[in-house]
Amino acid sequence: MTECDWEKKSTSASNSDTEMKPELPPCVNPGNPVFSCMLDPKTLHTTTSLSKPKMIMYKTNSSNYGEFLPMPQFFPCYYTPREQVFSSHIRATGFYQNNTLNTAPDRTRTLDFPNFQHTL
């Protein structure tokens, strides 16, 4: 096969790819839409009259968290507090405090190993 024949084949293959490019159905795979969406990611932008276009492929990040206020429809209907025995005990007695001075030698494996004794 000569170079000329190879070039003809490669150009004809690229032409046929552009002419007969099948349209992929959007989001046909079940599962996470971020990983199963068949649309071109460059076209996946959303915008409203009050906002600039945003990429919808990666919808949430830490800066968007809490952007919208909670809607009353999703509030719990009733509040049932749980027992707070542990919190009440800590509130009454305080956290444990160890105010003693540690004078015991540290006997970890690193310090007991002869090769590491003088590396600190």
Curated annotation (Swiss-Prot):
Tissue expression from the record = Expressed in trachea multiciliated cells.
User: Which parts of the sequence are annotated with region: Disordered?
Assistant: 1-25
Any Pfam family hit = PIRC1_2
Provide ranges: composition bias, Basic and acidic residues: 1-10
Picking any one GO biological process from the record gives: axoneme assembly
Per UniProt, the keywords (alphabetical) are: Cell projection, Cilium, Cytoplasm, Cytoskeleton, Flagellum
Kindly list the places in or outside the cell where this protein is found, as annotated in its UniProt entry.
Cytoplasm, Cytoskeleton, Cilium axoneme; Cytoplasm, Cytoskeleton, Flagellum axoneme
Asked whether the UniProt record includes tRNA processing among its keywords, one would answer no
Disulfide bond sites: none
Listed GO CC annotations: axonemal A tubule inner sheath; axonemal microtubule; sperm flagellum
Which function does this protein serve?
Microtubule inner protein involved in the attachment of outer dynein arms (ODAs) to dynein-decorated doublet microtubules (DMTs) in cilia axoneme, which is required for motile cilia beating.
Q: Summarize the subunit comment.
A: Microtubule inner protein component of sperm flagellar doublet microtubules. Interacts with CFAP53, ODAD1 and ODAD3; the interactions link the outer dynein arms docking complex (ODA-DC) to the internal microtubule inner proteins (MIP) in cilium axoneme.
Entry's family note: Belongs to the PIERCE2 family.
In its UniProt entry, what is this protein called?
Piercer of microtubule wall 2 protein
What is the species of this protein?
Bos taurus (Bovine)
Q: What is the lineage of its organism?
A: Eukaryota, Metazoa, Chordata, Craniata, Vertebrata
Q: What gene is behind this protein?
A: PIERCE2
